[in-house]
Amino acid sequence: MQSPVQKGIAATAVLAILLTIAGCASTGGVAPQASGIEPASLDAGNAIRAANADAQWPAVDWWRAYGDPQLNQWIEDAQAGNPNLAAAQARVREALSMAGVARSALSPQVNGSLSIQRQKWADNVYYGPGPLAGEQSWNNTATLGLSYHLDIWGKDRNAAERALDAAHASAADARAAQLELEGNVVRTYIEMSLNYALLDIAKATLQQQQQIVDLANRRLKGGIGTQLEVSQAETPLPEYERQIDEIEEKIALGRNQLAALAGKGPGAGDSIQRPTLSLNTPAGLPSALPADLIGHRPDVVAARWTVAAQARGIDVAKADFYPDINLLASIGGYAAMGPLFQFLKNPSHSWSAGPALSLPILDGGRLRSQLGAASAGYDEAVEGYNQSIVGALKDISDQVIRIRSLATQADDADRSVAAARKNYDLAREGYRRGLTDYLNVLIAQNQLLHAQEGVAKIQAERLGAHASLVTALGGGLDDPANGPQANETLPAHGKGKAATAGSNTGAVPANATAKVESAGRPDKAAPATAYTDRARNARPSAMKPSPAAASGANASAMSAVTATSVPAAAALPAKSGS
């Protein structure tokens, strides 16, 4: 004969089966619609195809190619002190903490309470006069409760993975912020170098003009010149002096900008010396472009992790369609009479244990709307990823075109300076001999000035184009060996990391490309643990890891600090709803 406990368990099991069959709401065919772009399928264009394809991916310290120790120091200072970068790193830590909160749902929850009170019982309350009316006694309780959610449908696990994926996306965003900061420092430094070159030209032009003024005065004294010629020669002097003042202002503002990028006050920039930039590195592209681009651009990596998080969100929304089962147990002691520790004695003890089941029956379409929102969020993330790929290739193509054009422009500008200098020397010599008037000298001088400024600007643009190409390639986010596999595009809905939980490989995807160190600066990292797929059509009950395995996997994930990794998957979700 069955005991009452056995009968209760059997009845609960039968009820659970019946409610599971009858109560599982239909998803109504709600499913994602977007498809991810395969980078290799995009036409890279003639500019990229014609570029040197034997180059390596940029080094993590790519700015050292400029050979300027002062620039190296300022970038290091900016990495250590920039408030915006520090805020991005704080967001990574926040996301990791939230991942820990989500992971905690995979573990049993144990709570205890203790209440020790001395109480005088009223004789006219809701319980009416009784044996305690008007008396004083100890009213003590102690309870210990345990709850454990049976994550049969993978809701808690997918929620934990979604939070961890969001943390990876946040780390990739932090790396993108660092790359932007590095690029801004380099561009500001290049602009300062240009202004120093323009200052040299302006000072040389002023000196040349002063020599012409002296020549005009000598001609006037010699009786072969006029006061008009002297006045014409003196007229440009204030403008040239104004240009010098303007350029010096720009240099000072550049110092302030560098100090601000490093999180310092303006005074820190006062010691900045003239840049000594030189760049002998030829422009080229990696041979694996565009296939490996998805593993080297931090914005693309962040977009892929966002897709992974949204895919987990779909799984969470689907799990809400199924019954929810919690195992509950409690034990306690209760005593309103007797000595202080009466509640700890056997007659005062009580306990309870059993499952608690809930399931959706009528929800007015709430669950389908939640699933629709999750699917739309996934589609939005996929299209954001697609746009990042398209934008990345455009950025690279733009810089390749610029570099090629600037190389040609540099040759043209050099010839222009040579011709303008020759013309200026002839005009000046002719004026000195009285063979031509001052107007020809002024025209020739302006032509030389513009030609020299053109050379300086093109040189600066070439330095800047190199920096822009490096940042377009990801700025040394990762080595090619740590990049994603050639057939990996997006993390697919229904392809998660749970399958590896039992092997204790952790929940951090493979191909880690950056990390946020404890000191707070994103930097290069070795690959993290494996990210493997589970079957698209796996039964929900097969998605549940053991509590110990799930706990170990997520602990391993959190111990990996902040890995900006590349989620691996070969396909997008199937379009059919389930």
What function would you assign to each model-found segment?
Residues 113-119, 147, 195, 236, ...:
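Outer-membrane beta-barrel pore domains and translocons
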Residues 156, 172-289, 402, 447-448, ...:
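Periplasmic alpha-helical coiled-coil/stalk elements that build and connect Gram-negative outer-membrane
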Residues 134-138, 347-349, 450:
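Short sequence motifs at beta-strands and strand-loop junctions characteristic
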Residues 140-146, 188, 289, 351-357:
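Hydrophobic, lipid-facing positions within transmembrane beta-strands of outer-membrane proteins
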Residues 210-213, 239-268, 317, 415-473:
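Short segments within alpha-helical structural elements
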Residues 86-87, 103, 150-178, 228, ...:
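Sec/SRP-type N-terminal targeting helices
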Residues 25-184, 325, 329, 361-371:
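Short flexible linkers and secondary-structure junctions
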Residues 2-80, 140, 164, 248-295, ...:
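Terminal intrinsically disordered/low-complexity segments used for targeting and assembly
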